[in-house]
Structure formats: C-alpha cells, structure tokens
Amino acid sequence: NVENKNLANFNDDFMVSARKFIKGDEDMLNTISYKIKANPPAVAVVNYVANHNTFTLYDAVSYDKKYNQANGENNRDGAVYNYSWNCGAEGDTRKRKINELRKHQIKNALSLVLLSQGVPMIYAGDEMCNSQKGNNNPYCLDNEISWTNWNTTAMAKEILDFTKKLIQFRKQHKILHLSSEPRLMDYKSYGLPDMSYHGSKAWYADFSHFNRHFSVMYCGKYATVDGKEDEADLFIAYNMFWEMIKFGIPSARNKRQWKVVFATDSGFKEPSDGIER
C-alpha cells in the first residue's frame, strides 16, 4: 500500500450511493453518511454524481432507462444500472411540476458533491443541464448527442448560478474540505465534535432503513488555521423523503445564531443574509 495524497481513488461508490439516496431508496443513510465524510489518509477520494460511463446528471433525473440505439449496437452497450429516476415522465417534458422536481433533484445532487469531504468533481455540462438524450455511452458519436450543449434555458441558467454559489460557499468554509477525515468526536475540547449527525431530534440520528433524512453539523473551530479566527459552524439538513420533515437543530455555539444560507428548493439567500459567513 502506498500513501500519497497526490493519488486519488476515482470510483463509482459515491455516485451510486448518492443517486440511490437522492431518489429516495430505502436503507441508504448508513452508507451516504459515511460517504460524505470519507477522506482516507492513504489516497484522496473523488466524489461525483455523473461521469463518462453513465447518464449525465440531467439525464439521471429524466430517464429510467438508456437509449443507446444511435450507437449501432441494438442498445446492448452502456451501463444497464444507472440508478436514475425520471421524476414522472420519460425524457423531456413541458410539465412544470416535473421540471421543478428535476431542478430540485439536480441541486440536491450538486449539494451532496460539494458539501462532502474529499475532492469534488462535476462532469462537464452538468452545471448547465447538459443532456445526451438518455444515451449513456456516446463515445462513438460526433453529433448533438455527444456534444456538450451549453444551454441558455431558464433552468440551465438557474443551475449554473446555483453551482457557482455552491462552489463559492465550499471555498469559504475550510471545514468542508479538511486535510483529514472527521473523527466524529471533540478531540480538541472545543465543546462540539468536529462533525456530528442529527435527525428529527438534535444529537440523535435515526438511520433506520425506512428513514430518508438526516443532518450534519460541522464545528468550524476545527478548521482554524495558524491561529486565524475560527469559521462558522455549519448545519446541513438532507431530506430525500417526499414530504416535509422537521429537524432538531443543536443550540448554536458561543451565543451565536443560526442563519439560513440556502435551500435546494429555493436557492441561495442574498450575500448580506449570510453566504459570506
């Protein structure tokens, strides 16, 4: 075994777990809660929700099955298991509720990638809702199916803007990209664990197979560098259930107050409302 952080583990484990979790599969909390904190000491880990061997992110929320007929192999090529969900209609649709749900799911996926430890990777075009029309293996094509479409639709513009702000938010909070994996304990006696899990009750995460929600709190002080002022604590709630869920939120540290920065169903608040904090 070689320990070298310049090497990275590029595999589909995070993607498969994230896609299952996002579309509401049962018994995913134990797996996804580990994946978002994974940052092994030996090599880096690359997190993504789409790559060149499967659906684009937009297609993962728009198609239940692959459409590779144009490849000339009778649709036998390409990954069979894409862990996708079309949100109610196969392919493009004009139904507003379905498109709103797809947009919401895309934001959920991007948030999982960019709010997790490890190295985030966004497949080119996913930030602009690029589609391959359900083709998950267009390596042999040189046409509009394989070309990256830099969309100018309202949805594409909204997703691009959301992605930019999410990247900015990650850069502003070192606690989201620590040099080592969180230990889930207060090993420096700061008053809070470096990372902790919560659920409908604060400090109690119920990872039962039927649950589809949990939350994470990061103690920003664990990201203090060279004596610089400690960062804000972060509380991130994940709910992939199809109904609203109430979360228990721990008391803020040192008489601070919690402030909402963004939600995937409504987007980011204005910078003056806390994105810089």
Model-based region annotation:
Residues H198-P250:
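Carbohydrate-binding surface patches
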Residues P193-K201, P271-E276:
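Surface-exposed intrinsically disordered loops and tails
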Residues W242-R277:
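C-terminal beta-sandwich/jelly-roll accessory domains of carbohydrate-active enzymes
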Residues N1-A124, M128, N137-L141, K174-H177, ...:
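Conserved alpha/beta catalytic core and glycan-binding cleft of carbohydrate-active enzymes
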Residues D92-K103, N149-K157, I275-R277:
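Active-site rim elements
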Residues N53, L114, K133, I167, ...:
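Hydrophobic alpha-helix feature that most strongly marks membrane-spanning transmembrane helices
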Residues Q132-K164, Q257-E270:
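Extended hydrophobic/aromatic segments used for targeting, binding, or gating
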Residues T152-R183, H198-K201:
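Aromatic- and carboxylate-lined catalytic core of secreted/periplasmic carbohydrate-active enzymes
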